[in-house]
């Protein structure tokens, strides 16, 4: 795992790791945590993570990490603790989309989705727990999805991985609570991200209708009348990482504009 450091953060700053941080929700989460005063290790397989960390500036560190590889995730955490002295927050954000009829799903496509979304979340939580248990404190935030609770046709594998992330979160909150570690899940809804637009393009092609029409149909089903943004998700992660959430653990919080009331 290669790392690239930028300006050192202030001494004793809280330290976070965000996976999948080169773009999309992960980049917005990393930016918010930096503004909150945290030092952030931004991890991704995307080479653009170095440019992203440079763009965010002071306190941002770039790291190459494939979350499907347990050894790389362990190394990411070890490097973070060695260089910055602590780990206060791990945001297991890395994820991929993908879907289609189950009869058409290849073994490789299945393994890719499960490997990143579920294996990656497990390896991340395990590595974070191993670092946080001796410290007697910490916060882990996983990224689920509203489709982990109610999964549409054609998204079975994706939904199954996110349901697994939600279940893992709830179990780890019970398991790690006695060590002072909080574990929560943020479940985005229909977000204005490339992953979501790609899914809608597949839907558009399958139905033979214009992409713009599909986008409007989805938007019409959101009570707040708009797609979500990375800023919306990052705000909830920021809260869960803060002392204001000191008594919040084992929760799955939808960020979906009311699309899936629970």
Language-model features, listed with the residues they occupy:
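Conserved glycine-rich Rossmann-like NAD(P)H-binding loop of the short-chain dehydrogenase/reductase
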Residues: 36-51
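Short, small/polar-rich loop/turn modules that mediate ligand/substrate recognition or access, typified
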Residues: 91, 177, 182, 248-250
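C-terminal substrate-recognition "lid" of short-chain dehydrogenase/reductases
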Residues: 122-125, 133, 224-255, 260-261
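Active-site helix of classical SDR
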Residues: 125, 161, 169
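Alpha-helical segment proximal to the catalytic Tyr-Lys
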Residues: 130, 174-178, 246
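Residue(s) in the substrate-gating loop at a strand-loop-helix junction
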Residues: 145
